[in-house]
Design a protein with these regions (language model features):
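Structured catalytic core of nucleotide-sugar glycosyltransferases
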Residues: 10-20, 61-69, 122
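Conserved beta-strand hairpin/beta-sheet module of binuclear metal-dependent hydrolase folds
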Residues: 1-47, 133-149, 166
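Metallo-beta-lactamase
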Residues: 86-141
Length: 268
């Protein structure tokens, strides 16, 4: 990696109310998901001193509203390209509205797409959406991996994402809070199931299975507003990892994300 051209990123928003992550190099600026209103994403970008008019493309993980809500308006307003797989395009067409054909691109699951100086890798996950996939972003031998919205982490996925430099990993719910909370039983079953979301404990287990000597940053993401707390997610993951002899905040930093506040800029 050259000193002048790191991969930089900020997790603009992460949670059950909306998700968006911004990444840049000297050549390209992209979003992974745009799950808030266009106005909210504009505001989040301004908080990190960046403008949406400089963003080249949005890479969409799946059609749930908290991941695609702003895709259509941003594509129309700023002329961004939009990448998603065929199943996601079919499922989100009514949510995102009309996007010019020349801005729409298919990103096949479990492939790598060269996007200028970025290599973007898609991988399928287990979630109750049409064809959900998440992404690893590779640049100059550095890798940032995003994995939220999955009911479990398969051996195939674990092998794909092992030893990235940084992760945004799902810690959606505390299992007891969810079980005792106000959600209907069918909704609780959906969240707890193999096509639902990772609990704090499951997120910790997944991290212990995939991080390696290159891993320096871990962000805990997609936290439920109703079934989790920031302090609880952080403490649970840190405690489990420390119990298994991981040196949290020494070998790597364990960071939190917020639903309406961007993270500081991180540099890989």
């Amino acid at each position: 990696m050259t000193e002048n051209d790191p991969l930089r990123y900020s997790i603009l928003a992460s949670g059950s109310t909306g998700n968006a992550t911004y990444l840049e190099t000297s050549q390209h600026r992209i979003l992974i998901d745009a799950g808030l209103s266009g106005k909210k994403i504009e505001n989040l970008m301004s908080q990190i001193d960046r403008s949406l008019k400089d963003v080249d493309a949005i890479f969409v993980t799946h059609e749930h509203t908290d991941h695609c809500h702003g895709v259509g308006v941003l594509a129309r307003r700023y002329g961004m390209s939009v990448y998603a797989n065929e199943g996601t395009w079919q499922a989100m067409v009514n949510k995102v509205g009309n996007i010019p054909d020349e801005q729409k691109f298919i990103f096949t699951p479990n492939t790598v797409k060269e996007f200028g100086d970025l290599d973007i890798e898609s991988f399928s996950v287990s979630h109750d959406a049409a064809q959900p996939q998440f992404y690893q972003i590779h640049h100059d031998n550095k890798t940032f991996c995003i994995l939220t919205d999955t009911g479990y982490v398969s051996d195939r996925v674990a092998g794909t994402i092992r030893n990235a430099d940084a992760y945004l990993m799902e810690c959606n719910h505390d299992t007891e809070m969810l079980r005792m909370g106000p959600y209907s039983w069918p909704l609780k079953q959906r969240i707890l199931g193999d096509e639902g979301h990772l609990s704090n404990e499951e997120g910790a287990d997944a991290l212990m299975n995939v991080i390696g000597d290159r891993t320096k940053e871990i962000f805990l993401g997609h936290r439920s507003q109703h079934n989790n707390m920031r302090s609880l997610a952080h403490l649970t993951v840190a405690s489990i990892m420390e119990d298994h002899d991981f040196a949290v905040d020494q070998d790597f930093k364990l960071e939190d994300t917020e639903p309406e506040t961007p993270s500081s800029f991180m540099v890989l």
